[in-house]
């Protein structure tokens, strides 16, 4: 299937590893010109080369050194790239921490990174999309936005907030060819996740396989997949939603969580 992304310009935040890198790679493979961002120049350039190679060197991949978790970094990106067709807000952090140990600074930090980074970019780029009557904005939320994990309540709050923002922005696109949607991955095999699962294991020094099995048995027992999701599985859905072919999908929260959420709506 041709996703009709050739000639489209896509910005993916949090794109030097994991889900973001997979999304950027998939979009580039479909012919989109891709913009990525990161704080560390070496890692940023490695990601750029990887994406460029995967596309067969057929598309432009622009790497902008900017910390999109900050307002200053957002301005750097906007100054470097004035207009885009597709915005994928993927930047995010997570940490397992008891509710009773969470300080005000913990709540604010995760909110500023997970929520405000996407709001800043959408606030700028959505204007141009509406003026040109085409655009796609996608928030990479999480199943945690619906099923708040007790070990990461602050994280769950930010993912619920993303769903609210995305739906609210979709309401502003009425009668246009601009859409705003959310994608909800489940636990995904990305950078740092294996260490995270091992840190939650009941016995010391478990193998990655043991930690993964225990995590799904104890903490995500409702998952039908019963394994970590591959980032490319999330990227495939995201690429379709970024495509002109998805024009009837707007204001939706689309799941790629392996059947973890036990509801049909």
Segments predicted by a language model, with ranges:
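Short, small/polar-rich loop/turn modules that mediate ligand/substrate recognition or access, typified
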Residues: 174, 179, 249-251
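Residue(s) in the substrate-gating loop at a strand-loop-helix junction
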Residues: 142
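Active-site helix of classical SDR
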Residues: 122, 158, 166
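Conserved glycine-rich cofactor-binding loop
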Residues: 9, 16-17
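Short C-terminal tail/terminal secondary-structure segment
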Residues: 147, 238-239, 245, 250-265
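Alpha-helical segment proximal to the catalytic Tyr-Lys
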Residues: 127, 171-172, 247
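Substrate-binding pocket helix/loop in short-chain dehydrogenase/reductase
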Residues: 98-99, 106-111, 219
């Amino acid at each position: 299937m041709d996703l009709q992304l050739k000639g489209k310009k896509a910005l993916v935040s949090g794109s030097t590893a994991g889900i973001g890198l997979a999304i950027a790679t998939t979009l580039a493979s479909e012919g989109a010109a891709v913009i990525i961002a990161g704080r560390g120049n070496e890692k940023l350039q490695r990601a750029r080369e990887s994406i460029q190679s995967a596309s067969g060197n057929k598309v432009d991949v622009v790497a902008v050194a900017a910390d999109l978790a900050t307002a200053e970094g957002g301005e750097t990106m906007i100054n470097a790239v004035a207009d885009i067709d597709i915005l994928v807000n993927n930047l995010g952090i997570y940490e397992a921490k008891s509710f009773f140990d969470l300080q005000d600074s913990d709540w604010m930090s995760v909110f500023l990174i997970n929520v405000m980074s996407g709001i800043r970019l959408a606030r700028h780029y959505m204007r141009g999309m509406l003026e040109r009557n085409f655009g796609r904005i996608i928030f990479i939320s999480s199943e945690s936005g619906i099923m708040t994990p007790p070990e990461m309540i602050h994280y769950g709050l930010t993912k619920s907030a993303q769903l609210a923002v995305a739906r609210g922005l979709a309401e502003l696109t009425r009668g246009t060819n601009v859409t705003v949607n959310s994608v909800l991955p489940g636990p995904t095999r990305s950078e740092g996740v294996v260490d995270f699962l091992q840190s939650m294991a009941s016995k010391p020094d478990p193998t990655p396989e043991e930690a993964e099995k225990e995590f799904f048995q104890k903490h995500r027992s409702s998952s039908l997949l019963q394994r970590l999701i591959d980032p490319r599985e999330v990227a495939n859905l995201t690429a379709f939603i970024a495509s002109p072919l998805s024009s009837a999908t707007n204001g939706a929260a689309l799941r790629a969580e392996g059947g973890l959420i036990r509801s049909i709506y």
